[in-house]
């Protein structure tokens, strides 16, 4: 028996974590690479070129308890939804596939700020006060504003919504 050096601790030794994260991320990248719209490509690249974001995205949980409630759960959930969007979009010729696939990627990214997953999963203060939809919208708007020339209507089309939000 000895002392455990918490600086060398790997949380995956103590809490449930996605085991094949690199493989799941590769699946996600392959599908997103099929997005042809230049503005959407720039937006997607802005996320994947951002190492601090990627580190947090790879580790984030998608929920506190109901689904994908483990480290890496947000990556897994996002990949599954992007796969579904890419598969279903061609069934609806009037739908812009690139927009649907990109929106599927964006839809829960606010959970990076909404949830924290240490030894236990819980909501952050921002998560309790405003939630992942508002946080995700702000994240997306900040990124699109940083890309010169992104059409404003495209920003509006990408605003994530949630079935729990009531219409006015």
Give a label for each model feature.
Residues 55-76, 120-124:
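Active-site flanking loop/helix segments enriched in acidic
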Residues 2-58:
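Extended, charge-rich, solvent-exposed interface segments
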Residues 7, 17, 71, 75, ...:
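Metal-centered catalytic cores of metalloenzymes
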Residues 10-16, 68-70, 124-128:
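A ubiquitous short alpha-helical element
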Residues 31-36, 66-73, 85-95, 147:
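Short helix-to-loop capping/linker segments positioned immediately adjacent to catalytic or ligand/cofactor-binding
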């Amino acid at each position: 028996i000895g002392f455990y050096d918490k600086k060398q601790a790997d949380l995956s030794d103590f809490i449930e974590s996605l085991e094949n994260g690199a493989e799941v991320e590769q699946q996600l990248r392959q599908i997103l690479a099929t997005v042809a719209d230049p503005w959407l490509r720039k937006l997607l690249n802005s996320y994947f070129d951002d190492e601090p974001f990627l580190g947090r995205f790879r580790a984030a949980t998608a929920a506190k308890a109901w689904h994908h409630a483990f480290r890496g759960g947000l990556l897994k959930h996002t990949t599954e939804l992007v796969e579904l969007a890419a598969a279903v979009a061609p069934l609806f010729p009037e739908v812009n596939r690139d927009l649907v696939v990109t929106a599927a990627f964006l839809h829960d990214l606010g959970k990076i700020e909404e949830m924290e997953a240490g030894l236990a999963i819980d909501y952050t203060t921002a998560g309790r006060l405003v939630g992942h939809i508002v946080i995700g919208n702000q994240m997306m708007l900040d990124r699109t504003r940083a890309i010169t020339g992104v059409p404003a209507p495209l920003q509006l089309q990408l605003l994530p919504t949630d079935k729990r939000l009531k219409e006015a």
